Each structure stands twice: as structure tokens, then as C-alpha cells.
A protein has these predicted regions:
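Basic, glycine/lysine-rich polyanion-binding surfaces/domains
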Residues: 1-195
Length: 197
């Protein structure tokens, strides 16, 4: 899989790397293969997405591709829990991908998949449901507990979602701000990803 030039790579390794990640990330670590990267995220205890990333199995553990601007936030969150496991999180010494995409190509790929990649401006702001992650295989409700899982499960089974992700194209008006208002001046939406093609 190809990533943008804004991504960096981390490694999680150790005899309990799978168990450690299972309690933190939103997908089932038992279903992660070495064939290709899968999208996932970590959430805070309020069920808000701290960051998204892509993960796959490698010989020594798990390789994670993440936006460089959020790698420190990812490490800070994980380092609260990793001391309780025989696991280690470190920078990937072989931090390279098959072919780096430019930002426009990467954004086009994400929009076509219907995935919003969390960045510094959106970190800890949205729930997975507001980003439609439950329909894009970024959440596995059968895997058991993970950080923020109670809040997220409540939204899945009993919640009333006020906002949800939509993809729009052929917009007539030039977007000047990330916030969208109706004619009465009430906020009705927010642009999270935008590409001009």
C-alpha cells in the first residue's frame, strides 16, 4: 500500500504486542494480516478519535503508518499503557513505503474510500460514528474492550447520531471556511477533507 510523504512508520513488538494493541485499537488484532495495511484508530475515554492510522503484521510485530504530525500524540497515549505489557513501541528504522503519494493523490484515495484521516486540527474532536468509521471497518464491535469502547458501543446500539459524514462533489460555491452554515446563519456542517480535481 502507498502512503503520502506526510506519513511516518512505527513498530510495536514484543511477546504481548497483540494483547497490548487489542486493548487500545478499534479493530481486532487477531484479524490483522501481513498482506496489507488495515485502517484503525485509537480513542480517548470519552470515545473521541485521537488519531487514525494503518496497521499490518510484520515478522517482528506490527507496523503502523501514521501522519507524522500525530505520531507524538499516538506515542503519548500508548506509553500510558505499554509498561504493563511485554511490548515496545519504537520508530521504524526502515521508515519507507513502496511509493510515496503526494498529498493530493493521498486525499483522493481517502475520499474515494470514504475515510477521514484525523489530523492535529481534528484530533479528539469527533466520535467514530460521526466519521462513519463503523461502516468502513475501522471499528470491530465483536472484539471486546478497547479505550472508549463503552461510549462508542452505546452510540452504536442506543445512540441518536446528530452528525454523520457525507461525501459531496460538484460544489458550486468555493469553500472559504471549514464550517458550513445555512441561510439563517446556523452551523450545519464542517468540511473535514477537500480536494480540487
Amino acid at each position: 500500500m502507498n502512503f503520502s510523504e506526510k506519513h511516518t512508520s512505527l513498530i510495536v513488538q514484543g511477546s504481548q504486542a497483540t494483547e497490548f494493541l487489542q486493548g487500545q485499537i478499534t479493530i481486532d488484532t487477531e484479524k490483522i494480516s501481513n498482506e496489507d495495511f488495515k485502517p484503525a484508530c485509537i480513542c480517548n475515554n470519552k470515545g473521541r478519535v485521537i488519531t487514525t492510522f494503518w496497521i499490518k503484521k510484520v515478522e517482528i510485530g506490527f507496523k503502523i503508518a501514521i501522519l507524522e504530525e500525530l505520531s507524538a500524540s499516538f506515542e503519548e497515549h500508548m506509553n500510558k499503557y505499554i509498561p504493563f505489557f511485554d511490548a515496545e513501541l519504537k520508530n521504524d528504522d526502515q521508515d519507507h513505503f513502496k511509493k510515496e503519494l503526494d498529498s493530493t493523490e493521498w486525499m483522493k484515495f481517502l475520499i474515494n474510500k470514504g475515510i477521514v484521516e484525523i489530523n492535529k486540527n481534528t484530533s479528539s474532536k469527533f466520535t467514530p460514528h460521526e466519521l462513519n468509521y463503523q461502516n468502513n471497518e475501522l471499528i470491530d464491535f465483536s472484539k471486546g474492550c478497547f479505550n472508549g469502547q463503552e461510549v462508542i458501543a452505546r452510540m452504536e446500539y442506543r445512540g441518536n447520531l446528530k452528525f454523520a459524514l457525507k461525501i459531496a462533489d460538484n460544489l458550486q460555491d468555493e469553500i472559504k471556511d471549514s464550517l458550513i452554515y445555512n441561510k439563517e446563519g446556523k452551523k450545519v456542517g464542517e468540511v473535514l477533507s477537500l480536494i480540487h480535481i
